[in-house]
Amino acid sequence: MSDIGTDGHAVRQDFLPQVLLPRRMRAGGHFTFAKLLEIDEKADRVSTIDNVEAKSGASGQLIFVTVRHEINGDRGARITEIENIVYREAPEKGAKPVAHRPPDLIAQWTRTITPDPVLLFNYSAATSNPHRIHYDRPYAMRTEGYPGLVVHGPLVATLLLQLLAENNPDAVVREFSYTAVGPLFDTSDFRLCGRVDGSAATLWAVDRRNSLALTAQATFRPKTRSE
């Protein structure tokens, strides 16, 4: 198991570049849906590293890695995902997350989510995400210094898409993007919010302090009769 790092991820230098900064997180992503995959359609995914960039922020040194995933079916392109990964220094012990103001918008629909270890573990398994901060509480708290298990940013994005779909059942999403702003943990509830204006949706998630955790945007079209 020498190819597995202490955080659960594969040792860097396999596909992702070797980065010595200890913390890894998903900073955001962008999806373009050219056409839906059909039942029984064969598909393949090709992943490439688009960019690696070093920056300095309030929390210290940052390394941003942009990965492109292209999913192609039997009859051409289906989904393109741009995955934004950030590596950062470990924060000082006892450091509290910075509060971020949510959008100055009136939500048309909201939902409260109570995260728990079962939800986080199942999402890790479904997305092949081995990062221990999502399911190993002693590791998350003692080694990485978090107050509890960390809620996946992509899980929050998925829940926001689900909220959009439930409130707009005839919408077919064309593009979806999200940006992680602050952390969420399994120690408290968080709230999903969203609204639609024309063929675009603004979505966001806030923690119990009403601090912004994740923001997202989607564009969509109405379903056709064949869909």
Show where each model-derived region lies.
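Short secondary-structure boundary micro-motifs
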Residues: 13-20, 35, 53-55, 96-97, ...
